[in-house]
Amino acid sequence: MATKPKRYLADPSLAVAQLGMDPQALMRDYQTLGLAFENLCMRDLLVYAEALPDIGFEPVRYYRDDAGLEVATIIELADGRWAALEIKLSEDKVDDAVNSLRRLQRKLCRGDAARTREPEFMAVITGFSQYARQVDENIYVIPIRCLTA
C-alpha cells in the first residue's frame, strides 16, 4: 500500500494562534477551520491507534497515489489488518469522501492487481453530523464527538 507519514501539530490551536485568529475569524474562514479540524482528528486518531494491540511502526498514515486518489488516514496493524478514514468538516462532503473510500477499496483489494486484503472498516469522520450511521457495506459516518476513550 502506497502510504506516507504526514506531519501534524500536537495541538491544532497552535496553528490557529500563530495565524492570529480568534474563534469568530476561524468560523468565517471555512478552509482554515477544515484544516484545523483535520489536525484535531488526526491527533485523536494517533492517540487511539497507539493504544491498539499489535500496532505496527507508524500505524497511522496518509494515502495518495499518482492518479490523485487521496485518503486522509490509513490505520494499519502489524498483522496486516487496516482501516481507511476520511475527515470532512461538514455533512456536505460525506458523499465525496465515501466515493474516495470506495475507489481506494476497488484499487487495492479488487481485480487482477489486488495486493492487499479488504479493510476491516472504512469511515468518514465529520464535524457537524447529528449521529453515527452506516452508509454502505463496511462504510460508516462518525461525528467527532463519538470518538471517545
Show which residues each predicted segment covers.
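Accessory nucleic acid-recognition modules appended to NTPase machines
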Residues: 1-81
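Residues immediately flanking
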Residues: 12, 87, 127-128
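Switch/connector loops and helix/strand junctions flanking conserved nucleotide-binding motifs
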Residues: 17, 94-95, 131-136
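Arginine/glycine-rich "motif VI" loop of SF2 helicases in the C-terminal RecA-like domain
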Residues: 51-54, 103-118
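Active-site ExK catalytic segment of metal-dependent nucleases
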Residues: 76, 81-93
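Mg2+/Mn2+-dependent nuclease catalytic core
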Residues: 90-110
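Short, hydrophobic beta-strand segments that form beta-sheet elements in well-ordered domains
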Residues: 118-126
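Domain-level recognition of nuclease-like catalytic cores that cleave nucleotide substrates
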Residues: 125-149
